[in-house]
């Protein structure tokens, strides 16, 4: 492993091998395009050609902060894991939606049904989001891997930066001032329960567990009103890591705002409320009039007393001081001016970004019309596409099948068709639909004997379920990947396929972009001649490409007629095959099978206990530690809470309840002493 540092670049690239194939020309072309000031470029890279490695080299050579946009959490997690391997010494961050579950606020007029907002926040991802914004403000060597969550409103970066607590050894500051500042930053005082986003006070020592940190806490030791020393320590064991001369504590939420901003926003909300009450009075709608007054006054009371309220994001326009219709502050506002953006699988991601606003707007309109929210709630929204275009830094679209938008906007198209491994695009075979199920059965058996895996894509959920049941009854180890499966479990299924826990994965639209499974040697596309989104030429090229990482890769398209989409997909695949074969012959390359270590691609994104191992290993037995003092008790509580959360995730509710009771007993003994 060679570590490379380019002149004037803060990045240290851990290079497992030098760029090869089309990579050197692609890297040079993109760097030249960035230097020439091209707003948009396209990297047309086939599956398995090392597009991620090319991106890493471009980032390292340019020396500029970067954001990589992906269209789903699975792909984002895969990119994040790879970028961390290339840049272990730099700030590689992960910015996706922190909701494990999210039910937005909504009103259904036909049934007079109001649905309250309900959500479950993944604390670890919330910490990573806060870490991303902190590093954007404090470091130059930052790479953010994000989903469309990046175009949704978060707190204003200017006000967020105003709310930091900067401490330095030798500073004169009273203990009560530090505590007051931490409370205003929405840190909780938890002398017993020391967790992320909290602080505790012990004599002249204040321990702060920064909201954006997963493993380090800050100890502020005071001597009278002077900061005597600052130490980083392990919040679980209490062991000191290092002494630091200065430290900046960032707020525990992106929505923290200074007190004077809150008061100004409250006055603005009152004015809008008055106008809305008058509107409903004129329209003779007393129910809506009373509803909006009651709900908004309750929120105002909370804002005056606490500085925040439930659903505070709906008042974001009043806090940011923006005019009606202006775009909300998003992650894009935190990016430095010299940032570069890569949009991975751009043929999907660009369309997805464009569609976010309209779905959100129709739901909000009902809430406004029926008095559940003030009209300003409409400005708590994702960016419209034209607004996103205005804030896009220099951008590289990355795709094997660029769509119309990329074709129209790209200043230059850089091709990366030749794979360094010499692997050739899969051979494409067309067979009749009539015998597709039985024909596929014999193909699957051939692959199983060779220790290879198979992906099967169908058109409907019902067909996928029936096919899975049928093959399962015949003794084939088969799983079905569908849209109801959450992100973590989806990653687990893909990992289990690679490990050989099953041999065949059936899906509908989930087997296309970005799935990196070198063990797959056969992709079967059922009903390939049914024209539509799932069988467009781009979809077919992407699906065929899933077998391109295997030296024996084959794609079978079951069809009774050859559609225009099929012809375009097969022709493009053949063009790429010929180019690769020619390259291999010229350079004497024998195609080599990719041997990629099987590990959890979300390693570092979700905790180890999230990886679903409990589901396969049965209940988690937790050894009870001996408790001699308060420090032992705090360690034991932290360990038991982890086990309790895992048991709940594994639906082992009785075990979770036992662990909860054990935690309660330890806390009671701490408070009142052992009986």
UniProtKB/Swiss-Prot annotation:
Signal peptide: none annotated. It is found in: Cytoplasm. GO terms for biological process: nucleotide-excision repair; SOS response. Residues 436-602 form the Helicase C-terminal domain. One of its GO terms (molecular function) is excinuclease ABC activity. Residues 634-669 form the UVR domain. ATP binds at residues 45-52. Keywords: ATP-binding, Cytoplasm, DNA damage, DNA excision, DNA repair, Excision nuclease, Nucleotide-binding, SOS response. Belongs to the UvrB family. HAMAP family: UvrB. NCBIfam families: PRK05298.1, uvrb. The UvrABC repair system catalyzes the recognition and processing of DNA lesions. A damage recognition complex composed of 2 UvrA and 2 UvrB subunits scans DNA for abnormalities. Upon binding of the UvrA(2)B(2) complex to a putative damaged site, the DNA wraps around one UvrB monomer. DNA wrap is dependent on ATP binding by UvrB and probably causes local melting of the DNA helix, facilitating insertion of UvrB beta-hairpin between the DNA strands. Then UvrB probes one DNA strand for the presence of a lesion. The beta-hairpin motif is involved in DNA binding. This is UvrABC system protein B. The lineage of its organism: Bacteria, Pseudomonadati, Pseudomonadota, Betaproteobacteria, Neisseriales. The gene is uvrB.
